[in-house]
Amino acid sequence: MKRSVKDSVFTYLFKQPEYTRQLYLALHPEDADVKESDFKLVTLENVLTTGFYNDLGIQVRNRLILLVEAQSTFSVNIALRMLLYLAGTYKEYIEEQKLDLYGSHPVEIPRPELYVVYTGDREEVPETLRLSDLYQGAGSAEVEVEVLRDDGTRDILDQYVRFCKIADEQREKYGLTQQAIDETIRICIAENVLAPFLASRQKEV
C-alpha cells in the first residue's frame, strides 16, 4: 500500500463533479439546488517558489472559494499554510478576471472558507485553528480554519475519514502490501464507505 494512498483518494475523489457537489453539500446542506456546473476547481499547482501544493480548491458560482486540506498528522501550522494557499488562489482569480487593484472602484472577490479534514487518531484537537495563535504578540491579520473530523453523519466527508481509518488499520496489519489495499477496498465496499468510487477505481488505488 502506498503511503500516499489516502492523499491520492482525497484528490481523485473530490475532483469528480458528483463528489465535489457532495462535499459542498456536506458543508452547506442549505444550498440543495446547487448544480455540478456551479463548481470550478481552483486547486493550486504551485504556491510562490516553495513548491507548496494544496489538496483541494473549489470556486462556487463566483461567490465562494473553499480550500480543503486532508491531514492525518495534526499541525497547528495549517492556518499559515492556508494563508499562502488563499493568497495564491486570489492571485490567480485576479489575473483571470483582469481585476484592477489600483483603481478607485471596489474589487469584488469570492469569500473564502477554509477547512482541514483531520483523519488521525488524536482525541483532542481544536475546532478552529487561527493564524493569530502563531503570532509572537498581537497582529492585525487573521485566518481561521475549521477542523472537520468523523461525526457519524455518513456524508462524503465522514466516509472519507472512515476510509482513512480502515486504510491505517489494514496497513498496520499487512504493511505496505497489495493485501492491505485489497482488504481496505473490500471492507469499505462492505460497509458502503466510498463504495461506488472505490469499486470504479479499484485498480488505481
Regions found by a protein language model. Name each.
Residues 1-205:
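Elongated, amphipathic alpha-helical interaction scaffolds
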